[in-house]
């Protein structure tokens, strides 16, 4: 059978082992060919091919529900659920998503992009099933580091207290998240993977006791305790812990042995109550380069399938913002042992990999545990350290309470560095960094800044380190800088709450924030072609706003435009409007940013165009709003 013929996972039923293994081979081929062409997550999906096939061979997917944690593990799932012919559109505009979306397929039972959610959602579905008197299986597949997240442990704690609720948790244990897993839980699991399973009597122990003379089915309480003690000896240490939490434990199982997986899943389906299946997999399985470099091949831009090397750009690109950040922080930390770099399982993505290599004693990776990272930083700050919490904007929102309760209320000098702020492109709505301005701006004591380019980012890193009077946050985008000259040292801190005028004009005020400062300058050039001269301000800070600069300009010019790469509700434009209103400066203001809508996966350029945020589009709208008599049909 060819993989393209599978439009429903139930078609796996009845296939021979040889056929299933051939399907596994085809999945890997399609997966590799597609990611090599489009880019995307490579290693996670390659590691769960056999797991997916074996599990789906034992389920009725017209009834049963499978939830995939994180979502980027689920590419084989997509290929087995009718999306083969669309798989080439993965992560492309109007194509299939790189994560799970309920609206994309009836087999995507719960949307996933962030980690550690599957057990909670699965338990909710299981409880709803029982309340309605229905009968179907619920399976939550967690792994790729997600078990280090506190939410997953909270769900395990809850499920373990529900002995009559049938739910299966499968741990895809590949010893990795994006980077290698860290922490005691990971170390504990690794010990189990490396030891020989001693389950030789666990599965059949009860039957053996029933056959004993005199006891039979009426075991005394004393013998029951003996039986339970022997069970604990007969499973690996982690199994004993899981069983103490209320789950029946199976494993560890070879995650690339289809017959063993099928047999284990069939046995696990017979268990009444919560069951935990521990599956040991290899991230990147079947592709030599991905197995050797599991961090580098977690996700890839388009690459040469034969060599594993990225397809070179047609022209050299400036360094990425994250690389500039990591380099600058490392240089500063070399001379200041108080600086502690903190990440949540994202060393490479946030640019802290070089920091980790050079200054391991000043580096902390907490795993997928953003809440812990923030409060940990608070404790470090209390003792005079300079903690730098480096987390993607979309993931920092998971620690909102800790930012308020543990940092801002106590006014602790923690430096938050929010990578991937703004439009992120192909990762789609679960990963867009749209909301950080709004969710941080409302918190007392917080200072928020954004650089216009990579050189200003260097100065803001110094500013954040030097700011000791309270918490401070810096947002910066995914991707490459503008190519401006960088300094190796001697960076100067910026004055808090002060912007700068980049261009002077007498007709309109353009207030740019962060990445949109460069766009503001481009808009000003277009307006100038129409005889309109704009003053362009690099705001630098959204909190505190530079009202000493903005107010006189707004009063004199009488027309204000704000530009930001974030949500309009509660964002930079809202801050400007509020400040002008409070000061009774009642001038017309037009805001440009992301409206109240989700931004789907596409290239950043496509998203900007869809949102009307390209320089020509903005110039056209400014002309229409303020200078209709000068508007032309074709701008830019």
Curated annotation (Swiss-Prot):
CDD domains, per the entry: TPP_DXS (cd02007), TPP_PYR_DXS_TK_like (cd07033)
Cofactor note: Binds 1 Mg(2+) ion per subunit.
Catalytic activity: D-glyceraldehyde 3-phosphate + pyruvate + H(+) = 1-deoxy-D-xylulose 5-phosphate + CO2
EC annotation from Swiss-Prot or TrEMBL: 2.2.1.7
Cellular component, GO, one term: cytosol
Catalytic EC class: transferase
Binding site for Mg(2+): 144, 174
Recorded metabolic or biological pathway in which this protein acts: Metabolic intermediate biosynthesis; 1-deoxy-D-xylulose 5-phosphate biosynthesis; 1-deoxy-D-xylulose 5-phosphate from D-glyceraldehyde 3-phosphate and pyruvate: step 1/1
Source organism, top-level taxon: Bacteria
Keywords, comma-separated and alphabetical: Isoprene biosynthesis, Magnesium, Metal-binding, Thiamine biosynthesis, Thiamine pyrophosphate, Transferase
GO MF term (any one): thiamine pyrophosphate binding
Cofactor: Mg(2+); thiamine diphosphate
GO biological process, one term: terpenoid biosynthetic process
UniProt: thiamine diphosphate binding residues: 72, 113-115, 145-146, 174, 287, 370
Database matches in InterPro entries: Dxylulose-5-P_synthase (IPR005477), THDP-binding (IPR029061), Transketo_C/PFOR_II (IPR009014), Transketolase-like_Pyr-bd (IPR005475), Transketolase_BS (IPR020826), Transketolase_C (IPR033248), Transketolase_CS (IPR049557)
A Pfam match: DXP_synthase_N
Known partners and oligomeric status: Homodimer.
PANTHER family to which the protein is assigned, alphabetical: 1-D-DEOXYXYLULOSE 5-PHOSPHATE SYNTHASE-RELATED (PTHR43322), 1-DEOXY-D-XYLULOSE-5-PHOSPHATE SYNTHASE, CHLOROPLASTIC (PTHR43322:SF5)
Function: Catalyzes the acyloin condensation reaction between C atoms 2 and 3 of pyruvate and glyceraldehyde 3-phosphate to yield 1-deoxy-D-xylulose-5-phosphate (DXP).
Entry's family note: Belongs to the transketolase family. DXPS subfamily.
Protein name, UniProt field: 1-deoxy-D-xylulose-5-phosphate synthase
UniProt organism field: Microcystis aeruginosa (strain NIES-843 / IAM M-2473)
């Amino acid at each position: 059978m060819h993989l393209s013929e599978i439009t429903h996972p139930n078609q796996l039923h009845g296939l021979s082992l040889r056929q299933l293994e051939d399907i596994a081979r085809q999945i890997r081929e399609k997966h590799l060919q597609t990611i090599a062409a489009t880019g995307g997550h490579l290693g996670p999906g390659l590691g769960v091919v056999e797991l997916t096939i074996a599990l789906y061979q034992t389920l009725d997917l017209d009834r049963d529900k499978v939830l995939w944690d994180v979502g980027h593990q689920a590419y084989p799932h997509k290929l087995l659920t009718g999306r083969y012919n669309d798989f080439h559109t993965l992560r492309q505009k109007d194509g299939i998503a790189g994560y799970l979306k309920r609206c994309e397929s009836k087999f995507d039972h719960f949307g996933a992009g962030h980690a550690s959610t599957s057990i909670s959602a699965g338990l909710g579905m299981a409880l709803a099933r029982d309340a309605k008197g229905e009968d179907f299986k619920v399976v939550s597949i967690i792994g790729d580091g997600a078990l280090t997240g506190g939410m997953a442990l909270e769900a395990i704690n809850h499920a373990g207290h529900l002995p009559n609720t049938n739910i299966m948790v499968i741990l895809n244990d590949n010893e990795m998240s994006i980077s290698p897993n860290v922490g005691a839980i990971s170390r504990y699991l690794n010990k189990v993977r490396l030891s020989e399973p001693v389950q030789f009597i666990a599965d059949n122990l009860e039957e053996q006791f029933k056959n004993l003379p005199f006891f039979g089915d009426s075991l005394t309480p004393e013998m029951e305790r003996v039986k339970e003690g022997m069970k604990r000896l007969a499973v690996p240490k982690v199994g004993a812990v899981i069983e103490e939490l209320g789950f029946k434990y199976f494993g560890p199982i070879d995650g690339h042995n289809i017959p063993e997986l099928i047999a284990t899943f069939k046995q696990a389906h017979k268990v009444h109550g919560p069951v935990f299946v521990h599956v040991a997999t290899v991230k990147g399985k079947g592709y030599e380069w991905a197995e050797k470099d599991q961090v580098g091949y977690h996700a890839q831009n388009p690459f040469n399938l034969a060599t594993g090397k990225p397809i070179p750009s047609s022209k050299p690109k400036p360094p990425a913002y994250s690389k500039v950040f990591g380099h600058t922080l490392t240089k500063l930390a070399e001379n200041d042992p108080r600086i502690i770099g903190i990440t949540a399982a994202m060393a490479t993505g946030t640019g802290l990999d070089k920091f980790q290599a050079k200054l391991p004693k000043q580096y902390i990776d907490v795993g997928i545990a953003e809440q812990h990272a923030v409060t940990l930083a608070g404790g470090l700050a209390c003792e005079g350290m300079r903690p730098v919490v480096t987390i993607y904007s979309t993931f920092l929102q998971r620690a909102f309470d800790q930012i308020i309760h543990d940092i801002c209320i106590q006014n602790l000098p923690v430096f938050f560095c929010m990578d991937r702020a703004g439009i992120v492109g192909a990762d789609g709505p679960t990963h867009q960094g749209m909301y950080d301005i709004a969710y941080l701006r409302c918190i007392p004591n917080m200072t928020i800044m954004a650089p216009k380019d990579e050189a200003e980012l260097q100065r803001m890193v110094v500013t954040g380190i030097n700011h000791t009077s309270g918490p401070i946050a810096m947002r910066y985008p995914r991707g490459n800088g503008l190519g401006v000259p960088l300094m190796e040292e001697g960076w100067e801190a910026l004055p808090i709450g002060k912007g700068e005028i980049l261009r002077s004009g007498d007709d309109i005020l353009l207030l740019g924030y962060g990445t949109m400062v460069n766009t503001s300058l481009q808009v000003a050039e277009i307006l100038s072609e129409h005889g309109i001269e704009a003053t362009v301000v690099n705001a630098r800070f959204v909190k505190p706003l530079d009202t000493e600069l903005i107010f006189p300009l707004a009063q004199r010019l009488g027309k204000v435009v704000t530009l930001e790469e974030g949500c309009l509700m509660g964002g930079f434009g809202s801050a400007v409007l509020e400040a002008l209103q409070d000061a009774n400066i009642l001038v017309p203001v037009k805001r440009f940013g992301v409206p109240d809508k989700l931004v789907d996966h596409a290239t950043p350029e496509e998203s900007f165009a869809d949102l009307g945020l390209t320089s020509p589009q903005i110039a056209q709208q400014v002309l229409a709003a303020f200078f209709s008599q000068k508007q032309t049909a074709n701008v830019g």
